[in-house]
């Protein structure tokens, strides 16, 4: 999965 804002546990989608 992908989450915004980024947290530990999911793929960081902050690009």
Curated annotation (Swiss-Prot):
Disulfide-linked positions: 1-14, 2-10, 6-13
Modification 4-hydroxyproline occurs at: 5
GO CC aspect terms: extracellular region
GO MF, one annotated term: ion channel regulator activity
Tissue: Expressed by the venom duct.
Keywords, comma-separated and alphabetical: Amidation, Disulfide bond, Hydroxylation, Ion channel impairing toxin, Neurotoxin, Secreted, Toxin
Subcellular localization(s) per the UniProt record: Secreted
Major location (coarse): secreted
Residues recorded as bearing Tyrosine amide in the entry: 15
Function statement: Probable neurotoxin with unknown target. Possibly targets ion channels. In vivo, intraperitoneal injection into fish provokes paralysis after 5 minutes.
Similarity annotation: Belongs to the conotoxin M superfamily.
Domain remark from Swiss-Prot or TrEMBL: The cysteine framework is III (CC-C-C-CC).
Protein name in the entry: Conotoxin In1746
Lineage, uppermost ranks: Eukaryota, Metazoa, Spiralia, Lophotrochozoa, Mollusca
């Amino acid at each position: 999965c992908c989450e915004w804002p980024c947290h530990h546990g999911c793929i960081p989608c902050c690009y």
